[in-house]
Amino acid sequence: MACARPLTGRTLPADESPCLTLILEPVSGEAAKNSTPVVVDKPGKPPPKRHRRQYNVTVSCNDCDKRLNFSVKTTCSTILTLQQLLTEDLDFLCSFCEAKNG
């Protein structure tokens, strides 16, 4: 299956929304104990690994327009999801602006 190439050269307009901090933490033992148990069948053959490629991503800081570069290694479907986040709902800050807005 051919993967659609994401539009990575897009410059996003400045947005006046407040900054959002996303903190990802593993589920604690207490929360896991209170959850509904999941019945798992005998493990069979593991699913085949999906083909992952490396992508270089450039975005602009939402405050000062500094170019921020990073690389990801993921599948075609996931890079398209990342593209959607970058162009619609996700703002990046450089380290200087993050400290300034702290």
From Swiss-Prot:
MF GO annotations: DNA binding; DNA-binding transcription factor activity; protein domain specific binding; zinc ion binding
SUPFAM superfamilies per record: E7 C-terminal domain-like (SSF161234)
Coiled coil segments of this chain: none
Short sequence motif named Nuclear export signal, residue ranges: 79-87
Keyword match Zinc-finger: yes
Renumbered zinc finger spans (unnamed): 61-97
UniProt-annotated stretches for the region E7 terminal domain: 1-36
Pfam families, per database record: E7
Protein's GO biological process: DNA-templated transcription; symbiont-mediated perturbation of host cell cycle G1/S transition checkpoint; symbiont-mediated suppression of host innate immune response; symbiont-mediated suppression of host type I interferon-mediated signaling pathway
Superkingdom of origin: Viruses
PTM statement from Swiss-Prot or TrEMBL: Highly phosphorylated.
Gene Ontology cellular-component annotations: host cell cytoplasm; host cell nucleus
Subcellular location, record wording: Host cytoplasm; Host nucleus
Leader sequence segment: none
Cystines in this chain: none
Gene3D superfamilies according to UniProt: 3.30.160.330
Keywords: Activator, DNA-binding, Early protein, G1/S host cell cycle checkpoint dysregulation by virus, Host cytoplasm, Host nucleus, Host-virus interaction, Inhibition of host innate immune response by virus, Inhibition of host interferon signaling pathway by virus, Interferon antiviral system evasion, Metal-binding, Modulation of host cell cycle by virus, Oncogene, Transcription, Transcription regulation, Viral immunoevasion, Zinc, Zinc-finger
Family from the record: Belongs to the papillomaviridae E7 protein family.
Recorded domain comment: The E7 terminal domain is an intrinsically disordered domain, whose flexibility and conformational transitions confer target adaptability to the oncoprotein. It allows adaptation to a variety of protein targets and exposes the PEST degradation sequence that regulates its turnover in the cell.
Subunit text: Homodimer. Homooligomer. Interacts with host RB1; this interaction induces dissociation of RB1-E2F1 complex thereby disrupting RB1 activity. Interacts with host EP300; this interaction represses EP300 transcriptional activity. Interacts with protein E2; this interaction inhibits E7 oncogenic activity. Interacts with host TMEM173/STING; this interaction impairs the ability of TMEM173/STING to sense cytosolic DNA and promote the production of type I interferon (IFN-alpha and IFN-beta).
Function: Plays a role in viral genome replication by driving entry of quiescent cells into the cell cycle. Stimulation of progression from G1 to S phase allows the virus to efficiently use the cellular DNA replicating machinery to achieve viral genome replication. E7 protein has both transforming and trans-activating activities. Induces the disassembly of the E2F1 transcription factor from RB1, with subsequent transcriptional activation of E2F1-regulated S-phase genes. Interferes with host histone deacetylation mediated by HDAC1 and HDAC2, leading to transcription activation.
Name of the protein in its database record: Protein E7
Organism of derivation: Odocoileus virginianus papillomavirus 1 (DPV)
